[in-house]
Amino acid sequence: MKEDPPSILQTQRFWDAFYINDRVAEFRRWLYIEAYGDEYPAELGTDGYITRSELRQMADALHVGPGQKIADMGCGRGGPGQWIARATGAALVGIDISDVALQKARERARQPGITVSYQTGSFDSTGLDAATFDGAMSVDVIWAIPDKRAGFAETVRILKPGARFVFTDWERDLSPPNYPPPFRDHLAVLKAVGFEIELHQVLTDAEAVRRVFYEKMLARQDELIRDLGEQAAQLRLREGRAWMGLIDGVDYLKHSRRVLVAARKVGHLLP
């Protein structure tokens, strides 16, 4: 029987719990550094798989600059969006369902050289005005959205004609049990809601590096339990075992592709 998607309140509680534990974030950050080396932007406090090279590529693909405004959809702690704002000179509005994440993003934003603001909202209901943004971005969020078409439709709604939506995410043929169902094709849904595709790039080394991340995490499970406590540690360890096929024998990383996508809202081209 098909399960109903989680309610807004359930989703908020899940992500608040995810973001509130700074010890988990710090432990994962060290694992990212070990897996990615200098490519990992540790200074941004990000809790995802974004790299410096991908951030530069996203900034270029947005085609925005000073005097323009971009939305960071599912901004989390805000680090990648703030990097993009600084690199492009554009103002940024971050949207996230977690008030805990937004508070951490606001604290991180207390620095000169960027214009940023944050407000509570979901990917498919941002509360932003229509056709007012010169670009939108998202880092490793879309996989968790139950209704991806609604999320893409909301993104196209807030963008001006010709504006770009640039994001990283995963396309998957299989997902472990108790994870969101696999999503294989962003492009068809993007086109259906009014985007034209400018870039669809499979990040070829991404899942190999994610495997290294999980291997290092499992190798340090005693340290993880000591630092995070049994319950929090076992959640992270189960994630690694599940994706590597150590629970049911299916290596799900072999059925997963991390992608970088740039799509333009149909209309006049931006400079």
Where are these regions (language model features)?
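A short acidic, Gly/Pro-enriched loop at the edge of an enzyme's catalytic core
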Residues: D124-A136
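Class I SAM-dependent methyltransferase SAM/SAH-binding core
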Residues: K69-M73, R77-S125
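N-terminal, positively charged/glycine-rich alpha-helical extensions of SAM-dependent methyltransferases
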Residues: M1-D38
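Conserved Class I S-adenosyl-L-methionine
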Residues: L203-P271
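Conserved class I S-adenosyl-L-methionine
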Residues: R164-L187
